[in-house]
Every structure is written in structure tokens, then in C-alpha cells.
């Protein structure tokens, strides 16, 4: 998550990205966030009725826009300046601090801060030289892979699995 968020913030800082593209991306993210907060927008998203089982079916679009922003920033990584960390770090730390008070939040916050530190290290180490590029990419891919594994593990632990014996018989 933090690799995508950090790169998305870099996308907003990068001067090579047109203002129109930045405004459209931020506008979409804001619209999706408002749709999560206000049931009326959720009602319109679902064709004029409130869903019974799966509210916020459109929530994957938020992640998709964030990933598109991160990919666009990835393609412009040669433009990265260390001063962008003064924007990236507070934004990401603010997101981490939003988890205060949640169950098991300290462990999650520490792991998130560690992931953020590794992402920032990878961004600082990135240079057009081949060896530095490979090191930076390896660090970013390691963080992204670890975040994916943790998300999958937490999702499976939260929802749990159904055994074959629990299936209805015909």
C-alpha cells in the first residue's frame, strides 16, 4: 500500500505531469472517498437501490486510480528529487496515524512505518545507473510483495476458510 501511496504523492509533486492529469486523478480519488462516506452516492452507484450483501462494490476503482498514479510516477522516477520526501513522508505518516486506537494498531503502525522507510530508501537510492536502478527496484518489489502477502494473510484470517464438509449436500 505505501509503495503505491508514496509513488502517487510523487506523481502529484512531479513537474513533468500535467496539471490536468493531476487534477483529474485527485478529483476521482476525492469522488470515491465521498462515495464511501455518503450513502446517497453509494445508492446512485448501485443503480438506485442499497445493496444487501456487498456495499461499495466500486471500491476497487479507488485502488485502481491510485495504482495508475503510482505507475505513472514509476515511469518518471528519473525526475525524483530528495526534497519530494518532505511531502511524501508527512502524507504517509498521516495515513499511518489514522490507525491509532484500532485493535492491534501499534504492530500494524510499526510494520507500516518500516515499509514506508524501505520505500523512501528505495526512492533515495534510485539513480539512472543500472546497478542503483536494480537495487531500488528490488527494494520496492520486496516491499510490494511483503505488503501483498500480509494483506492476503490478514484477509484470510479475518474471513477464514470454509471446509468441504460445510458445503450443502445435493
Where are the predicted features?
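Secondary-structure junction/capping motif
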Residues: 1, 169-170
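Hydrophobic, aromatic-rich transmembrane alpha-helices
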Residues: 1-30, 119-127
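Contiguous transmembrane helix-bundle modules in multi-pass membrane proteins
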Residues: 26-40, 49-169
